[in-house]
Amino acid sequence: MEASYDIMSRTEPGNDQIASPKERLKRCEIDADNVRYPYCMVWTPLPLISWILPMIGHTGICTSEGVIHDFGGPYYVAVDDMTFGNPTKYIPLQLDETNIDDWDRYVERGDKAYGQMMHNLCCNNCHSHCAYVLNQAKYKGNTGYTMIHIWWMFMIRSKYVGFSVSFIDHYQFIGIHQIIYWIHGHTYDSCFTILFN
């Protein structure tokens, strides 16, 4: 079944009124094959960094049509081409009447603001870009989202795109640590003995 993402103008059959926000959100379908995640935040691993620390990754935020926007580097916001590859996790956002109609405008504001900013891994990054959009939209009545809030949301609320990417994400972490153990087994064991005794 092919999904249509023109939900802002979609109407019920025989009804001239635009569908309610809740109806529009229900009709939004995640289409991982075509990399479309309407009204979602998305996450992808950072090469090497996420293999060692799997809780660290790169985020983006999606329009009503599912197009990904991500702050990919200094003065650069990628659109429909996520900087570090296709998402492996996503969070469907729970929007309401107060912010769904202008959602794309909030994403555009975030792009405009972050397209003029220097990227910094520690304090002005892709997570900050997502937080900015949520603050503009007053997501869940809040305007105080930070990069830490976005990180935490991905830790507790994200869903994997599929089993295979879930397996690969975890396998990379286990594989890297297994290689470290093979190379420096005695040192690795000593570190854990010191830490946990």
Regions found by a protein language model. Name each.
Residues 2-47, 53-124, 135:
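Non-catalytic ligand/cofactor/substrate-binding and regulatory segments of enzyme domains
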Residues 2-12, 112-197:
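Activation targets extended, charge/polar-rich intrinsically disordered C-terminal tails
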